[in-house]
Amino acid sequence: MPRSARFRPFLATAASGALVLAALAGAGPASASSAVPATLPARAHGLGDLIYQQKPLRVATYNLSLNRGAAGQLVTDLSTPDDEQAKTVAEVIQRAAPDIVLLNEFDYVEAGVAVDLFRQNYLQVSQNGAPAVSYPYAFVAPSNTGIPSGYDLNNDGTVGGGDDAFGFGLFPGQYGMVVLSRHPIQTENVRTFQNFLWRDMPGALLPDDPATAAPNDWFTPEELAVVRLSSKSHWDVPVTVGPHTVHVLASHPTPPTFDGPEDRNGRRNHDEIRFWADYISSPRSGYIVDDAGQKGGLTLKDSFVILGDQNADPRDGDSVDTAIDQLLENWRIQDPLPTSSGAVEASAVQGGANATHQGDPKYDTADFADTAPGNLRADYVLPSRALRVTDAGVFWPEQADPLFRLTGVFPFPSSDHRLVWVDVRVPRFRL
């Protein structure tokens, strides 16, 4: 089915000024007859130019696979400017030049040591003639990956190892994440949800042991008292853009695979995605409590962008059927549908599972195994409707492009994921 149906823009033309103002205040969706595409031609927009800041804000997400197999190895690799993978992913970021970017699979190191080294030795140094980029603001926090739970969460009869951690990882912080920004981060207002328990989500899709008649009993009551929802964490990182605040909602749900018939990872992936759908939807957010004890989610007046490798494709792959639809079909969210010609070419050349996919390959963001699951749309930049989308794309060059060397084919010089970016115009005033 055509993907364009998912993009249900809310902002009306400049002539409908009252409707635009209502949208920014968090009113309900416009009727189909009054809505127009959020990506508009480059021209004067009258009232729209009075409402929105002139310069677009480029927001991106990038699973750069800058994880290592042992604690401390990433710091060692980034301590010099010579790590080839780090140079390559840094050049990808320099070529895309986002103002705000979420980096997934960047090992957490206390005090932000690895982040500082990556900025100093790679991003702030021109790679192959690409303009260096500077991100004076960064947010990094612990991840659930690799933290021992003390329980046999995968029910294999032993306690310990990555599968029994709160999030899969060989050491604490493996596969962590980072937010980098050219605009000030309101550090004092950041909210994290690392410790939120899965059982505390109403109607959670808790996994079921197929060997018993009882429902949702994969975990024991003792395990449910400690099992966390986030496989890494969920972050609400407010960023100041002019007089306006944009909430960067960052996460990296677990892959919906590497389990059994209980589908514990598929169900967790679904609920990790659902968390943001509830967080932006008052009063559904009432059950949410952050790590500091503050309850609730965003208000209807708050602007936001949901970022991250969600590990869920709307048409293909192994995720629960409606997992990513919880965001793509949420009335507060725009789906800019970023595309690339490189993804189309890769699908055709690689074949395999790609040949049987239902989704259009131009939306793919990850180059996975050709046998299964094939290439998928896994990475998302989803702005709220109070932001005006002007452009979007996926950094996936075709093979004939000189920049194809940055993405390549397996074994990848950078990552099996591609950087996804969206340009938005932010309101000029506080709501």
Which role does the model predict for each range below?
Residues 8-12, 24-179, 206-228, 237, ...:
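N-terminal, active-site-proximal structural segment of metallo-dependent hydrolase catalytic domains
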